[in-house]
Amino acid sequence: MINRKPTRIELNMEDIEEYEQLKKEQTNSYKQQQQQQQPTTISTPKQYPLLNTTQPPKKTTAQIIGYDQ
């Protein structure tokens, strides 16, 4: 393998400010979407997951190697 010097990545204050601004915008849009969806989720009944009865119970490691009989 060729030995290379590590790549140097410089981070400017402008980059940090831009990141913080984008993060705020995304969190605000996410909160707005959640608030818009909230009334619809309250009116719908809860749906419970279906039980999967077609698969046999999983064996533990001890059962697989024959330690637990």
From Swiss-Prot:
<dbReference type="Pfam" id="PF10471">
    <property type="entry name" value="ANAPC_CDC26"/>
</dbReference>
<dbReference type="GO" id="GO:0031145">
    <property type="term" value="P:anaphase-promoting complex-dependent catabolic process"/>
</dbReference>
<keyword id="KW-0132">Cell division</keyword>
<keyword id="KW-0131">Cell cycle</keyword>
<feature type="coiled-coil region">
    <location>
        <begin position="8"/>
        <end position="38"/>
    </location>
</feature>
<feature type="compositionally biased region" description="Polar residues">
    <location>
        <begin position="39"/>
        <end position="63"/>
    </location>
</feature>
<keyword id="KW-0498">Mitosis</keyword>
<protein>
    <recommendedName>
        <fullName>Anaphase-promoting complex subunit cdc26</fullName>
    </recommendedName>
</protein>
<comment type="function">
    <text>Component of the anaphase promoting complex/cyclosome (APC/C), a cell cycle-regulated E3 ubiquitin-protein ligase complex that controls progression through mitosis and the G1 phase of the cell cycle.</text>
</comment>
<keyword id="KW-0175">Coiled coil</keyword>
<dbReference type="GO" id="GO:0070979">
    <property type="term" value="P:protein K11-linked ubiquitination"/>
</dbReference>
<comment type="similarity">
    <text>Belongs to the CDC26 family.</text>
</comment>
<comment type="subunit">
    <text>The APC/C is composed of at least 13 subunits that stay tightly associated throughout the cell cycle: anapc1, anapc2, anapc3, anapc4, anapc5, anapc6, anapc7, anapc8, anapc10, anapc11, cdc20, cdc26 and cdh1.</text>
</comment>
<dbReference type="GO" id="GO:0005680">
    <property type="term" value="C:anaphase-promoting complex"/>
</dbReference>
<dbReference type="GO" id="GO:0051301">
    <property type="term" value="P:cell division"/>
</dbReference>
<comment type="pathway">
    <text>Protein modification; protein ubiquitination.</text>
</comment>
<feature type="region of interest" description="Disordered">
    <location>
        <begin position="23"/>
        <end position="69"/>
    </location>
</feature>
<dbReference type="GO" id="GO:0007346">
    <property type="term" value="P:regulation of mitotic cell cycle"/>
</dbReference>
<dbReference type="InterPro" id="IPR018860">
    <property type="entry name" value="APC_suCDC26"/>
</dbReference>
<keyword id="KW-0833">Ubl conjugation pathway</keyword>
<keyword id="KW-0539">Nucleus</keyword>
